[in-house]
Amino acid sequence: MKVAVLGAAGGIGQALALLLKTQLPAGSHLSLYDIAPVTPGVAVDLSHIPTAVEIKGFAGEDPTPALVGADVVLISAGVARKPGMDRSDLFNINAGIVRNLIEKVAATCPTALVGIITNPVNTTVAIAAEVMKKAGVYDKNRLFGITTLDVIRSETFIAELKGLNVADVKVNVIGGHSGVTILPLLSQVEGVTFTDEEVASLTTRIQNAGTEVVEAKAGGGSATLSMGQAACRFGLSLVRGLQGEANIVECAYVDGGSEHAEFFAQPVLLGKNGIEKVLPYGEVSAFEANARDSMLDTLKGDIKLGVDFVK
């Protein structure tokens, strides 16, 4: 099993690489790529950790050597948010980065499962899909926008609010991966009831949690460590699915035939072909139905931005 991390010298990439080095199955290969010259050194640093995961780092303009034979590609390359920016401000820089990297993925490892972390995810996933369509290699079951950070934040904040063991909290988050498009389905959390006020405040906190971190870091970065953990959780789920493990379900932003938008985050069953099945997200409350319906114009606009960028 070979996993490639593109953008591996950045804050998310280094955290993700560290977690993968310690958690990938024995015998796996971990390939790190970044434009930054430090990247081979990051790999050397991580290679001193005593796990049976081979690691190699590549720097420079061309990610191809890192991508050869990759089963899973996780893309975190790009610029991070700073105070006052929202995820769409990142579009102007990150759109081109994702396009260029996906062109190389399409040419080098077209059947790999691709997980996109680079923001704005609502748009960068649409860019990736269009690039792969142009290259004639698009498989909607192999492309994912990683929204796991919204899920782990939801789990954490619910457990804190209700005094629960966080390991027992499971929550689906649907929609997209920015602002109002992030919709935690709090009405479905088992064994927990929320007041209307709690639902409103929790939903808003989850939607704005990225800004909470950006502001707390006072210009020194964005949510890199929690995103690294979220991306590792999702990446390991992709690997477990590829290895034939049953019942691996994660929420992800996918081209899943949603009635709501071309790309939509919802639970998916993972397997040897990536998405084995897009799962229904179930009954929602009136609050959630309203929030879902009112986000769709924003989400569709984000998607169109990506499609138009490639065309």
UniProtKB/Swiss-Prot annotation:
In which residues is substrate bound? 81, 87, 119, 153
User: Which keywords does this chain's UniProt record carry?
Assistant: NAD, Oxidoreductase, Tricarboxylic acid cycle
Residue positions of the active site = 177
- Which InterPro entries does the UniProt entry name for this protein? L-lactate/malate_DH (IPR001557), Lactate/malate_DH_C (IPR022383), Lactate/malate_DH_N (IPR001236), Lactate_DH/Glyco_Ohase_4_C (IPR015955), Malate_DH_AS (IPR001252), Malate_DH_type1 (IPR010097), Malate_DH_type1_bac (IPR023958), NAD(P)-bd_dom_sf (IPR036291)
**Catalytic reaction(s) noted:** (S)-malate + NAD(+) = oxaloacetate + NADH + H(+)
One GO cellular component assignment for this chain's record is: cytoplasm
- Report the EC number(s), separated by commas if there are several: 1.1.1.37
Top-level EC class, please?
oxidoreductase
- The residues that hold NAD(+) are 7-13, 34, 94, 117-119, 227
Q: Which GO terms describe its molecular function?
A: L-malate dehydrogenase (NAD+) activity
Alphabetical list of Pfam families matching this protein: Ldh_1_C, Ldh_1_N
Q: Which GO biological-process labels does this protein carry? A: malate metabolic process; tricarboxylic acid cycle
Quaternary structure, per UniProt, is:
Homodimer.
NCBIfam families, per the entry = MDH_euk_gproteo (TIGR01772)
The protein's matches in HAMAP family, at most eight in alphabetical order, are given as: Malate_dehydrog_1
- Describe the family membership recorded for this protein in Swiss-Prot or TrEMBL: Belongs to the LDH/MDH superfamily. MDH type 1 family.
Q: What does this protein do?
A: Catalyzes the reversible oxidation of malate to oxaloacetate.
Name of this chain's protein: Malate dehydrogenase
Lineage runs: Bacteria, Pseudomonadati, Pseudomonadota, Gammaproteobacteria, Alteromonadales
